[in-house]
Amino acid sequence: MQFTHNISGMRWVARDAPVGSKIYSATSTGIAGPGFALNCDNDGSLALTANMGTPLPVAPGTFPPVDGKDVTGKVLQTSIPGVGLYLELGGFLNGTASNTFQANDGGIGAVPYVGENQRNMAPTPLVMRNLIIKYMALIKTGPIPAGISSFSQEVVRGVVSDVGDAVRLTLGGQVQQAQCTVKADAVSANPVQLGTHDIADFTGQGSTTNPVDFFITLSDCEDDPAGSVARAFMRLDGVDGSVPVDRDLGLFTLTTDSTAAGIGIQVLRSDNTPVKLEEYVDMVGLTPGITRLDLRARYYQTAATVTPGEAKGALNFTIEYR
């Protein structure tokens, strides 16, 4: 009996989502059969089996639970690099009634498994016309190619006692990564001009100048138009001698070629909350096309005395999509 099911729609996953992230899941999926039935009967004296095997390799390594399910050792590698499939069967191939097989993994029915029946099926024998997928999930197993990736392949080959090759299931679907590009002119002003200030503008440690707005543009953003699945995370690291003064405050030193002293530079979000340094910070959900990271920067007095001169700072930024 040949069964075929296509997962509807494009399934999106953030480019830098960790291995083990769920891309898609569904429960209680019924698939119509080819128009004839698989018939089995048992008076309890026979041990009938339904060996639900798979031609797909098992993805190596351990995975975190998905929807509370232990999937390690049962994630099947699809033809899309980095995309695995976890599949539980139900219905006649894995149930609790006397006229069903019961999976030998405690009734979970995670492919591959062997279903067993040694019970009296009377008064109703097993008559299987349709296939039930109790639960399925697409799971990230590694790097996924950019662009649209498709799969359509046989995922289950079932051998049933006295019948032989009895059940085959083909699944198909499409997966695309959510991501953007960072162009050379991504920063609205580079360098960001923080202005010229008098020594009198600094009234003591912790005093600041007025913040200057700037932004970083993420271009060519691709994400689910029905609702973003990815968020942009940004990491800021000092270069050219700029190092953190207070990571949590987003405060860093001037560059080594600066001649001013006693001040640093602070990076803020548009709402004036600090952007932490040297760690990835959740900034914003992706918008298809253009996504903008709105930021501000200002001078921040770090010492009791401020020495006038040129005051420069330098940071590198790195973006991940999770």
List the predicted regions and their residue ranges:
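Mature extracellular/passenger domains of Gram-negative fimbrial/pilin and adhesin proteins
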Residues: M1-R322
